[in-house]
Each structure stands twice: as structure tokens, then as C-alpha cells.
Swiss-Prot record:
ATP binds at residues 260-267, 324-333. Residues 232-464 form the Sigma-54 factor interaction domain. GO terms for molecular function: (S)-limonene 6-monooxygenase activity; (S)-limonene 7-monooxygenase activity; ATP binding; ATP hydrolysis activity; carveol dehydrogenase activity; perillyl-alcohol dehydrogenase (NAD+) activity; sequence-specific DNA binding. The keyword rRNA-binding does not apply. This is Limonene hydroxylase. GO terms for biological process: regulation of DNA-templated transcription. The keyword Flavoprotein applies. Optimum pH is 7.7.
Length: 543
């Protein structure tokens, strides 16, 4: 269409060649100088230029072409461009000014309206995505468009109710993940909050839902009161069961073995058992077997007499067993104790007597032992032979499992607020004790490999960064937590590919020709043929 016929028509875009701002004047001047004065500059050319400029800046700054590093660098950054400032939001989309232009006889556009402020992208749902059965379309819609950029819950199910995809909001609400089978009661629960439901002719279902009158979907604490065992509080049913066992164990002198990942709070639970026991007025002595050199563990545990070895203290020294007399000895990382010392430890537990290194005198002790490890001691016994079975069964009167923090999502809010309160007091009343819903949602979506110890460190960092703010916001959290939801599980991709293959096979069975099958699937005949070769679908499948 020539300028004569285009004149008077309107167009909406972020960029027009006639845009009168310094960045565009410089850009247009450079383009005409390089490609000629008659060059017409389109928005595609301007966008390409801006994109290359942003990526180049990232590469120069990072001195790396790693895709993930570049994406992380670009998040939440604002760049000047021929169309004005462009901001790359954390959801991968751009926000920038939008304008409406009216074409004139010169082939240019007169700007008749401008938003005058950045407009964020908001991808819209179409009605053809799911029915197309095309992997790229499904993946683009579910993961890139709606998955993690919305506070609404997004679920994709196959015809057997197996979850092919669940975003963090769906996980927070229903505690489900990819590969789980959605239960009927869970389906009823979301049916009252449905925003959109799509079902393809081959049974793939999409649900978009939200909870009424709430902001971001969070792991909400149950209505009942939390279970309290001393200083330990939980809303988690599994952990509550373990704490009830710990409460019973605290009223006896029986040995306790605490199992849990690093940073899950094993020593805190051991101290709580001691504080709730009849031995509460006695000493609580802790020893980490994994943090002491092998040659020193024996002297730390059992003590030594003067002259027992080179460098021995004059007058000797009592070991941890003697120091803990009348109280509790906590042996952390018991799985790291050298095999040769496990015999001596077993003897002390059985006889309730200790012999210092270099001595022959038996000293009676009255000690309750609580051991802890992050290892699977049964495997250490059965497959590696690095832990004695008789010692294991001596320690294992009561076994208490501490669930990892990733399985205690409902406790994250309580723990975070308690840490904030502690830091508020530690820093003499400075800082905030409040956590925004958006920040809490990110905390609940993160996997927490370092468990409670990592959470405490993250909260302390956020507290200090937000020292003058009214509440903790997502910007105060580390990048790995802010970007945690951007990670795409490989298994989800594989499941979607399996669904695509099954859909193609089903369509071929129900069709009389490739053309008919392609039409049912919403793809071209050539694309279908390529997919048949890609998935190695046998021709016998086609009727």
C-alpha cells in the first residue's frame, strides 16, 4: 500500500521513525548515514537494534556468552533506545511507552497519542492453543505466557488426571507438582475459583484458578493452632507427628537418634528435648563429630590424663561425657565418627563408665545421649560398612525424622516472621518485622537446599537491605530465589513431548488421510509428516 492510500490510517506501536526524542534522532541519523537518506526505518529495525544493544552490553559487562548469565543480568534493567527507555521485567517481557500514530502523505506517522509511561506486556489467552496439539504452542502458552508471571494457579492435566504442569501458585495452593495425580477433592476445591478451563479433543485439560478475595496464592497456615514442643513450632502434620514422639522421648532417659538434612534444625530439636526433660537443670553439651580431626575426637569425648600424649595439658582434661554428667550429650554428625572409635563409644553407652586416654580408672557417668546425622545409617551399615550396626541399634531407641524445609512450606511464614522479630530486637528496634505477600510467595516457592539455616541467612540479608522499608519485598531477596520460578523442569518438557506423540498417533488412527489428521491436529501436512519422522511413528498406525 502506497503512502497515498495509507494516509489517514492509524497504527499502534512503541516506535515510529518520526518520534522526536534525542535517542531516536541519533538513531535515524546513523541509519541514514549508513544506508542512505531514502531509508525508511521500521519498528522491526529499531527493535532489532535495541535488542542487539542490550545483549552486547550484557556480554561486555559479563565477559561471557552464557545464556543464563545474560538473562539474569538483563532482568529488571532499564535501557535507553530509539523508542525511549525499555525495561526488561523479571517475567522476561518488556515494558515501554506505547504510542498511536496517524500515517501522513510523506509515509511517516504523526504521533497522536502517547502513554507517557511504560506499559508492561500482558499476554492474552487464545482459544486455539491447547487444541493445536503442537508442542511449541503448548509450551509457549503454559510456561512462558501464563506459568510463572501470574499469581493465579495454572494446571495442565492429561486424560488420566496426571499433572503435566503446575506453576508455583498451583503448588502453593494444592501442594501438587508435575507427575502427581490430581485428587477429586482437589479438583472440587479449584472448581469454585476457576477463571478458565480448556479441554482439547484428546483430553488435555487446562485449569487457571485463583482463591477468592486473596492476593498472591500462598501456602496458608491451617486454621488450627500450631503444634508446639518447647521452642519448636509447626503447622506441618508430618513434623507434628515426629514432635509428639520427641515429647514422649523427652520424659525418659532413652537414647534418641535425630535424622535430617543439613541445616534442618537437628541441634535445636536436641536442645528442646533436653529443656523439656527432667535433666533440664543439667548441662547440655554438644560435639560435632564431623568438625573435629579424627585424632582429636577420642580426647574430646573421653578426656585424657597428664602425659597421655605430646601436648597433653598438665593435670589432664575431662571429656565431653564427664562435662555432660547429669545432663545431655548431643553428638552431631554421628555418621562421620571414625569406625575404630565407635567401639569405645558403644562400650561407654553400655557400661555408663568412661576411661580417659592414658588412664585405667573407670569414671561413672550419668548422661543421656542424643545423636544426629544427615546420613542414611542403614545404608552405611549395609553397603559401606562404615557404621557399626550394634552402635546404631544402641542409639536408635527413639528415631525422629525432621522433614526438609521444602516439605514444610506452611512453616516458612512463621519461621520468617520469627527471624525478623529476632533481628528487630538484635538491632535495637531498627528494621521491619513485616513480610510482603509477594516476597513470601517467592520464599515458599524456593527449594531450600540449605533448609532453615539458609532461610535464616536469607531473612537476615533481606532485613538489612530493607532496614528503612516498611516491609520485605522481592527485590530484597537473593537473585536465585527471585528467579527460582523461571527454571523449567526437564521432565515437564518430556511429558509434553509424550502427549504430543500420543495425540498424533490417535489422530492418525481416527483419520483416513494425512491431510485429515493434520487438520484435526491444527498443523500443516508437512509439519505432521516431519513429526511422524521425528517420533518414528510406524505407518501401520495410520489406518
Amino acid at each position: 500500500m502506497g503512502s497515498k492510500y495509507a494516509a489517514g490510517h492509524y497504527s499502534c506501536s512503541s516506535y515510529f521513525q518520526s518520534l522526536d526524542i534525542p535517542e531516536n534522532r541519533q538513531f535515524v541519523q546513523g541509519m541514514k548515514k549508513r544506508y542512505g537518506q531514502d531509508t525508511v526505518i521500521s519498528s522491526v529495525m529499531a527493535n532489532t537494534y535495541s535488542g542487539i544493544q542490550m545483549i552486547l552490553e550484557a556480554i561486555v559487562h559479563l565477559r561471557s556468552t552464557d545464556r543464563k548469565k545474560i538473562l539474569n543480568y538483563l532482568y529488571n534493567k532499564t535501557f535507553p533506545s530509539p523508542s525511549g527507555n525499555i525495561t526488561i521485567e523479571s517475567n522476561h517481557h518488556l515494558s515501554r511507552e506505547v504510542r498511536i500514530g496517524q500515517a501522513n502523505l510523506d509515509g511517516q506517522f504523526d504521533i497522536v497519542w502517547s502513554s507517557e509511561q511504560p506499559i508492561p506486556a500482558k499476554p492474552l489467552m487464545t482459544n486455539t492453543i491447547i487444541d493445536s496439539a503442537n508442542e511449541e504452542q503448548i509450551w509457549k502458552y503454559v510456561v512462558e505466557s501464563m506459568g510463572e508471571e501470574t499469581a493465579d494457579g495454572v494446571l495442565v492435566l492429561d486424560q488420566d488426571q496426571t499433572i503435566l504442569y503446575a506453576n508455583s501458585a498451583a503448588y502453593s495452593f494444592l501442594r501438587v507438582k508435575q507427575g502427581d495425580i490430581l485428587k477429586e477433592e482437589q479438583l472440587r476445591e479449584i472448581s469454585h475459583q476457576l477463571i478458565k478451563k480448556e479441554t482439547s479433543k484428546y483430553g488435555v485439560q487446562l485449569f487457571i484458578f485463583k482463591r477468592a478475595k486473596r492476593g498472591p496464592l500462598l501456602v496458608t497456615k491451617p486454621d488450627k493452632e500450631p503444634y508446639r514442643f518447647g521452642r519448636v513450632v509447626t503447622y506441618n502434620p508430618s513434623f507434628e507427628k515426629e514432635l509428639r514422639t520427641a515429647s514422649i522421648a523427652s520424659q525418659s532417659d532413652a537414647n534418641v537418634l535425630i535424622l535430617g538434612e543439613t541445616g534442618s534444625g537437628k541441634e535445636v530439636l536436641a536442645r528442646t528435648i533436653h529443656e523439656q526433660s527432667p535433666r533440664r537443670n543439667g548441662p547440655f553439651v554438644a560435639l560435632n563429630a564431623g568438625a573435629i580431626p579424627r585424632e582429636l575426637i577420642a580426647s574430646e569425648l573421653f578426656g585424657y590424663v597428664e602425659g597421655a600424649f605430646t601436648g597433653a595439658r598438665k593435670g589432664g582434661r575431662p571429656g565431653k561425657f564427664e562435662v555432660a554428667d547429669g545432663g545431655t550429650l548431643f553428638l552431631d554428625e554421628i555418621g562421620d565418627m571414625p569406625l575404630e572409635l565407635q567401639v569405645n563409644l558403644l562400650r561407654v553407652l553400655e557400661e555408663r563408665k568412661v576411661i580417659r586416654i592414658g588412664d585405667h580408672k573407670e569414671r561413672p557417668i550419668n548422661v543421656r545421649v542424643i545423636a544426629a546425622t544427615n546420613r542414611n545409617l542403614k545404608e552405611e551399615i549395609a553397603y559401606r560398612g562404615s557404621f557399626r550396626s550394634d552402635l546404631y541399634y544402641r542409639l536408635n531407641v527413639f528415631t525422629i525424622h525432621i522433614p526438609p524445609l521444602r516439605d514444610r512450606k506452611e512453616d516458612i511464614e512463621t519461621l520468617s516472621l520469627q527471624f525478623l522479630k529476632n533481628f528487630h530486637q538484635h538491632y535495637c528496634g531498627k528494621g521491619t518485622c513485616h513480610l510482603s505477600n509477594s516476597a513470601l510467595q517467592l520464599l515458599q516457592s524456593y527449594n531450600w537446599p540449605g533448609n532453615i539455616r539458609e532461610l535464616r541467612n536469607v531473612i537476615e540479608r533481606a532485613f538489612l537491605l530493607a532496614i528503612d522499608e516498611p516491609e520485605i519485598l522481592p527485590i530484597h531477596l537473593p537473585e536465585e530465589i527471585q528467579n527460582a520460578n523461571c527454571a523449567i523442569p526437564p521432565s515437564s518438557v518430556n511429558n509434553l513431548k509424550d502427549v504430543e506423540k500420543k495425540m498424533i498417533e490417535q489422530a492418525l488412527k481416527e483419520s483416513k488421510s494425512l491431510t485429515e489428521a493434520a487438520k484435526k491436529l491444527g498443523i500443516t501436512r508437512s509439519t505432521l509428516y516431519r513429526k511422524i519422522k521425528q517420533w518414528k511413528i510406524h505407518k501401520t498406525t495410520f489406518s
